[in-house]
Amino acid sequence: MMWGAGSPLAWLSAGSGNVNVSSVGPAEGPTGPAAPLPSPKAWDVVLCISGTLVSCENALVVAIIVGTPAFRAPMFLLVGSLAVADLLAGLGLVLHFAAVFCIGSAEMSLVLVGVLAMAFTASIGSLLAITVDRYLSLYNALTYYSETTVTRTYVMLALVWGGALGLGLLPVLAWNCLDGLTTCGVVYPLSKNHLVVLAIAFFMVFGIMLQLYAQICRIVCRHAQQIALQRHLLPASHYVATRKGIATLAVVLGAFAACWLPFTVYCLLGDAHSPPLYTYLTLLPATYNSMINPIIYAFRNQDVQKVLWAVCCCCSSSKIPFRSRSPSDV
């Protein structure tokens, strides 16, 4: 992804802040050798390293879920969707680095920009689906474990990936700024309008997640109070348990906001002439979200930890005793 119209990745025109796309071409141009490939800057290398770490983490999660028959519950399908999306995002960052600095292919770079847009959109959409699943598991606790839940999960996955695919195809098909550099946003070759659409979609998802987590906190507090009364627990015990649950939800939502809000706001405020360094500084935390998602939604789960331990000890995951699971465990 050529992160800014003034970015070193964007092959700057001499004396201007616009992108000279014509400098990316075949090995031999019509009048001689093509321009040399750009040299990566420190932040380009950092993004590539981040993509590598993201790919490795999420590939491990995908392998665990696919290779463990016990992980076929709806909640693990959603976590698997999140891991696949983040895996694609990590691979997209690495391949884009290669496309820009090793191959010099503008066409490949454009396709990878679409892949990254699709992957990050699917990642955020999967986070929303996980939040919806958590809420419904508490709100409809008695009917959650039914065929309806499985059907609903597949519907949510279809909507998430269908929407992500649509937004990812837009820059590849036509909605880009290759022919009109003045319409570029902070991420070349995505147009300003495309970035605005993505930003609005993010704020809608974030608003829904805020509302759902607020409802989850209310339900958790009410359930904890009822359990405390039934078991005659001390108020202090009820308070500690409730506070711990709310703190966990706050960490989950806070991490998501801290990673994505800076870049989303910058997409709305910046344009093609904005300093590319700001794009890197706001985009890098967004990639960290794909890095911490496996920790929050997979590796904290005790059953996943058992599988990891079994793999390290060369044991079969089919022999591992799994406890009953609920979405709140993920």
UniProtKB/Swiss-Prot annotation:
A lipid is attached at residue 313 (S-palmitoyl cysteine). Signal peptide: none annotated. GO terms for biological process: adenylate cyclase-activating G protein-coupled receptor signaling pathway; positive regulation of cold-induced thermogenesis; regulation of meiotic nuclear division; regulation of metabolic process. The modification Phosphoserine is found at residues 324, 326, 328. The keyword Coiled coil does not apply. Expressed predominantly in the central nervous system, and at low levels in the lung, kidney, testis, ovary and eye. Highly expressed in regions of the brain implicated in the Alzheimer disease. The gene is GPR3. Glycans are attached at residue 20. Belongs to the G-protein coupled receptor 1 family. Induction: Upon cold exposure by a lipolytic signal in thermogenic adipose tissue. InterPro entries: GPCR_Rhodpsn, GPCR_Rhodpsn_7TM, GPR3, GPR_3/6/12_orphan. Keywords: Cell membrane, G-protein coupled receptor, Glycoprotein, Lipoprotein, Membrane, Palmitate, Phosphoprotein, Receptor, Transducer, Transmembrane, Transmembrane helix. Residues 63-74, 133-153, 218-245, 300-330 are cytoplasmic. This is G-protein coupled receptor 3. It comes from Homo sapiens (Human). Residues 1-42, 99-110, 174-198, 273-277 are extracellular. Constitutively active G-protein coupled receptor that maintains high 3'-5'-cyclic adenosine monophosphate (cAMP) levels that a plays a role in serveral processes including meiotic arrest in oocytes or neuronal development via activation of numerous intracellular signaling pathways. Acts as an essential activator of thermogenic adipocytes and drives thermogenesis via its intrinsic G(s)-coupling activity without the requirement of a ligand. Has a potential role in modulating a number of brain functions, including behavioral responses to stress, amyloid-beta peptide generation in neurons. It is a multi-pass membrane protein. One of its GO terms (cellular component) is plasma membrane. GO terms for molecular function: G protein-coupled receptor activity; sphingosine-1-phosphate receptor activity.
